[in-house]
Amino acid sequence: MNMISPYCFFLLLLLAAFGFYSQGFGATQLPENEVQALQSIAKTLGINNWNPSVDECNKRQGRNNWSSCWEFKDDEYQNVVICNCSIDTVCHVTNLCMKRQNLPGTLPPELVRLPYLQEIDLTLNYLNGTIPREWGSLNLLNITLGGNRLTGPIPKEIANISTLKSFVAESNQLYGDLPPELGNLTQIQRLILSSNNFTGELPATLAKLTNLQDIRLGDNQFSGKIPDFIESWTNLKALNIIGSGLSGPIPSGISKLRNLTDLRISDLSGSEISSFPDLSNKSMKYLILRNCNIHGTLKDYLSTTEISQILDLSFNKLTGPIPPSYKELIKVNYIFLTGNLLNGSVPSWKSDATSLDLSYNNFNKDNQQCQYGKVNLFAASSPTINNSGIVSCLRSSVSGCPKVNSIHINCGGTSSVKVKGITYDEDGRDGTALFDRGQNKNWAVSTTGDYMDVEAEYSTASLNDTSALSSNDAYHQLYNDARVSPISLTYYGFCLHNGNYKVKLHFAEIMFTNDQTYKSLGRRLFHIYIQGTLVEKDFNIAKEAGGVGKAIIKAYTAAVINNTIEIRFYWAGKGTTIIPKKSVYGPLISAISVENENGGSISTGAVIGIVAAVVIIIIILVLSVLWWKGYLGNKNSPSRGPSILAYIAAAHQSK
């Protein structure tokens, strides 16, 4: 009998060992208690098509090399269980990623039965209820709950999770004061609480969160001033307090945040004056200080600040000229200086800018164009320079224009629409920092802003499924399209007869859905101004109309005294920004109707007709008096029968 060589024997032994290991690994299972926990969690979340088993980790083979739910794309549907199978040759659940499933249940307290769990991601579902206090006993690293229907306050027990690095609960309906205990989360790096209903002042204990890198508190109802203690967040990279309810001034301590690359502050409450913070020697992606009541001049050092995406200083009280050094900012994707008091000459480098908005300022009248490439110059000159009522850049093109009594606009529509015999003009041009005046039209549109955090550049919206509209009246075709804007949207009418006008604004929310999915949970709010007067604050289309896809017409009276009318819509930082996707927020308008209440001023022909009629009546009266006196043959007037006046009186009585 042939003997097996040592080499072959070793090879067979190695193969046998590998086969044994493979069999053992393939049979690695979840402990029964974790299986039961998953089954209970699935029931609480409202998952009907998932029955977890001991082979749950093996069924998801290949995913156990992933370490976090963040490794998936933002727009992906997720139903992922990540396991760690290297602990005592037994698998344990470490991550639950249940994203974009429209789950209708509640947050599961049963998570405490998964002792190795590090992350729970339930973003963009339809979950309701409160955040379980029981979660405070877990050793979680990441909690992500954005885009649901969660209510109630943040339980103070959450602050017991000393391992927590990220807590995301944006775009829910949470309320109440932030618990001071949150200051105990000393390991936390991300705290995202935007788009809720939180109130009260920010707890002073938050100063202890020195590891914070990203904090977002926008779209809430906080009170008090922006706290000075933010200067203690020395590792901070992103600060977002857009429309937060907090008041100014902007703390000077922001200059100490050397790692800051994303600063967004807008629409501060109160009337406190802010100075321009020192942001020199920084490299920033976003610098947004909008409507913060900032006084003073533009700072030269901004020209050396590396700003890559957006510089937005709109709607402040900035004065003086644009510094020549700002030519270095032409590489910034978007620059918005709208609505300030800037003066001097429009910079010569404007033609090199990627996208620049200088509308509504006090620049010298050395420019006759409202749009120069991608530069919006509408109303960029001082109104004191032009007393005609027409903004300077339109003055020459509409000089001597015939007066009209109405304006009708199919906002965002690519074609005109005829409704009840009235034509609504098309308004379909797209883009940011946009000014557009259609040919032979007596109106223009100006829009300001860029949708943040997405590579989207649009200013119109369309409804693909017109069956979603519940409007069946004659105006329904006006609601298939709309014009939208990230910040400010202005319609400007000119060549109008002076007088009182009825302004009708047509709205229908067409970017959210009317169902039980996360896409229905968006909230859109914006201000409406007519002739500079605020007529609607935080206007919510769906709420006013009684639901998504329902039309509503808001009517107002406006006085036109200089042949012009201005209708402006402004986003003050309120409402969700991630539902149904990022970039859905800000003003939306479907159609505009402006009509003279008196049916218009009297035409020249009508005036001639009226004058002629008056002259004839006067002649008749004079002749009648003369005849009555006997100068026209009436020698015995009492006996000569009825006069012309009597016939006239008799004729009136017979009617």
State where each predicted segment sits.
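Plant-biased, solvent-exposed loop and capping regions
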Residues: 1-482, 535, 540, 568-579, ...
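Short, surface-exposed beta-strand/strand-loop-strand elements in extracellular ectodomains
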Residues: 513-534
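Folded extracytoplasmic luminal domains of secretory or organellar precursors
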Residues: 115, 507-509, 520-524
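A short tyrosine-centered beta-strand micro-motif
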Residues: 496-513
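Residues within well-ordered beta-strands of beta-sheet-rich folds
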Residues: 410, 502-506, 529, 557, ...
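Short beta-strands within extracellular/lumenal beta-sheet-rich domains
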Residues: 467-498, 551-555
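Short, surface-exposed tryptophan/glycine-enriched loops
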Residues: 542-581
